[in-house]
Amino acid sequence: MGNFTSSVDTGILTFFFEGELDTICCMEIGDKVLNQMKEHKEKVVFDLKGVDYISSSFIRLCGSAASLVTSSNISLVNMNKEIKKNLTKIGLAAVLNIK
């Protein structure tokens, strides 16, 4: 099961995710992530360095997050090749900054 920590540095809200971001995990963390984003609507980074798996619920969370800030102000970084490939296949790379 996954979890996250967050920090704000130089105006950028960064979420550091770990583990498997499955449906149950996303149901538990989704509101926490979105509530923090509502307070900080500038630049947001989802750091996926410690993530092994994402479910469609995490993709939905990304969509909800993008609706709170301008999509050009949200980035997904440090993901493994498989996750990056899947996000690109479904078109999320065209909407969010995926690095």
Mark where each language-model region is:
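STAS-typified acidic loop motif
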Residues: 2-31, 50
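Short acidic-hydrophobic, aromatic-tinged amphipathic segments that line or gate anion-handling sites
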Residues: 97-99
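Amphipathic alpha-helical interaction surfaces in cytosolic regulatory modules
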Residues: 23-95
